[in-house]
From Swiss-Prot:
Site (Transition state stabilizer): 16, 25, 246, 345
InterPro entries listed in its UniProt record: IspD/F (IPR026596), IspD/TarI (IPR034683), ISPD_synthase_CS (IPR018294), MECDP_synthase (IPR003526), MECDP_synthase_CS (IPR020555), MECDP_synthase_sf (IPR036571), Nucleotide-diphossugar_trans (IPR029044)
Designated gene of the protein: ispDF
Lineage: Bacteria, Pseudomonadati, Campylobacterota, Epsilonproteobacteria, Campylobacterales
EC id: 2.7.7.60, 4.6.1.12
Protein name: Bifunctional enzyme IspD/IspF
C-alpha cells in the first residue's frame, strides 16, 4: 500500500476570478473536460497514490462524483476547512495536496516533492524572485525570498495538529507556525496560479472548449383546486383556481428547471428541491430557477435558447405570453430573444381538456463558455 494519498482542492467559489466571468475556474473546459478533472487525472498518474480525493462545493459533490471514480468530499467555507474535511477520509500517513488553480504541474516537480518524503513534516516546491523586493520600507535580499507553490507533501498527523494553531493559506505555513520542519525543493514557473480573468492567457496551448451544444427537456403537470389565480413562468394569471402543489405550483418554471438540469446532466428538480423538504413549502419558483441558473453558469454553461409549450384549456394564456418571456429573461438574466413561450389547448382532450390542470413541456439548448473568446484571453 502506498504511504501517500492525493487531495485535489476543487471546492473554491473563485470569487476573484468570477469578478469578470460567471464560471468558476475549476469548471473551465479543456475540450469537454473540466479543469478540476484534468488536474486530478494528470496528478493521479504521476505516482502510486493509495487514495485520490477531490473537494467540491456542496451543490457540486454529486455532479463531480458522476464524472470520476475518485472520492469526492464536500468542502468547507475556506481552503483549510475543505482540506480538513478531506483529511478526515485520508487513510495514509502522508498526503500530497494540490490546487486546481495550478493546473499545469510538471511531472518532475511531483518527483522532487515525493522523492523527499520523510525528510520533513512538509515538502513544498518554491521558486525565487527576479525583481527587487521591498517590505514595509525595508529592502530584502532576493536570494532570501521564495514563492511557495503547490503541490505540497505533508505528514497528515502533523498537519492536523498544525491547523489547530489558526487559519492558514497553505500547509507549509501551518506546519512552520507549529514548529515543524518545512523542506523547500525546486518548483517551476509553469506552476503559476490561475486567480484572475486576465490570467486566462496561461491556458494558451491547451485544448479549447468543445463547441457543440447540449439539449435538455423537461415536462411537468399540476392539477387545479379552488383558489385565487395561477402563477406561470413567474407571472400571476387571474383565475378562479390555483395549483395543487408543495411550492407555488409554477409548472412552467418546474419544467424549465428540469430541462436546464437535464442539459447539464445534473439531475432533476425532485433531487434539488424535494417536496418532502419544508423549506420549499409555498416557495416562489423564480427563486429556485435563479439557484439553478447560477449553478448552470458556475459549472461553465451558457443558455442559448429556452422553448416552453404550455398546454391549458383554461384560462386563456395568449395575452400573457410576452410577460412570461420577459419575466423568465429577467430571472435568468438573458435576452427575451432567447426565450419562447407558446400556449396551446388539447382540443378538449384529456385532463387538460377537461380543465383539470396544466401541462408544460420545455426544451433548452446550452453550450460551454468559450474562454478563448473572452477579452482577457485575447489581450
Amino acid at each position: 500500500m502506498s504511504q501517500v494519498s492525493l487531495v485535489v482542492m476543487g471546492a473554491g467559489e473563485s470569487s476573484r476570478f468570477r469578478q469578470g466571468l460567471s464560471i468558476k475556474k475549476q469548471w473551465l473546459r479543456l475540450g469537454e473536460t473540466p479543469l478540476w478533472k484534468h488536474v486530478a487525472l494528470h496528478l493521479s498518474k504521476q505516482a502510486c497514490f493509495d487514495q485520490v480525493i477531490i473537494t467540491a462545493s456542496p451543490k457540486e459533490v454529486k455532479y463531480m462524483q458522476k464524472q470520476v471514480d475518485f472520492e469526492v468530499i464536500e468542502g468547507g467555507g475556506t481552503r483549510q476547512e475543505s482540506l480538513q474535511n478531506a483529511l478526515a477520509s485520508v487513510k495514509t500517513p502522508w498526503v500530497l495536496v494540490s490546487d486546481v488553480a495550478r493546473f499545469d504541474v510538471p511531472s518532475e516537480v511531483i518527483s522532487r516533492v515525493i522523492g523527499r518524503l520523510g525528510e520533513a513534516e512538509c515538502v513544498a516546491p518554491a521558486i525565487g524572485v527576479s525583481d527587487t523586493v521591498s517590505y514595509q520600507g525595508e529592502y530584502l535580499s532576493r536570494s532570501e525570498v521564495k514563492l511557495i507553490q503547490t503541490p505540497q507533501l505533508s505528514h497528515v498527523e502533523s498537519l492536523l495538529l498544525a491547523f489547530r494553531q489558526g487559519d492558514f493559506t497553505d500547509e507549509s505555513s501551518a506546519i512552520a507556525k507549529s514548529g515543524g520542519r518545512v523542506l523547500l525543493v525546486e518548483g517551476s514557473e509553469r506552476l503559476k496560479k490561475l486567480t484572475h480573468p486576465h490570467e486566462l492567457t496561461l491556458l494558451q496551448g491547451f485544448e479549447p472548449p468543445f463547441g457543440g451544444c447540449y439539449g435538455g427537456s423537461g415536462f411537468d403537470v399540476h392539477a387545479f383546486m379552488e383558489g385565487e389565480g395561477l402563477r406561470l413562468a413567474g407571472v400571476n394569471i387571474p383565475a378562479p383556481v390555483t395549483f395543487k402543489a408543495h411550492s407555488d405550483g409554477d409548472v412552467a418554471i418546474h419544467a424549465l428547471i428540469d430541462a436546464l438540469l437535464g442539459a447539464a446532466g445534473a439531475g432533476d428538480i425532485g433531487e434539488w428541491f424535494p417536496d418532502s423538504d419544508l423549506a420549499y413549502k409555498g416557495v416562489d419558483s423564480t427563486l429556485l430557477l435563479q439557484e439553478v441558473i447560477k449553478f448552470i453558469r458556475g459549472i461553465g454553461f451558457e443558455l442559448i435558447n429556452a422553448d416552453l409549450t404550455i398546454m391549458a384549456q383554461a384560462p386563456k394564456l395568449s395575452p400573457y405570453k410576452e410577460a412570461m418571456e420577459r419575466r423568465l429573461g429577467e430571472v435568468m438574466e438573458v435576452s427575451r430573444q432567447r426565450i419562447s413561450v407558446k400556449a396551446t389547448t388539447t382540443e378538449s382532450l384529456g385532463f387538460v381538456g377537461r380543465k383539470e390542470g396544466v401541462a408544460v413541456s420545455a426544451q433548452v439548448v446550452l453550450k460551454l463558455l468559450d474562454w478563448t473568446k473572452h477579452a482577457c484571453f485575447n489581450r
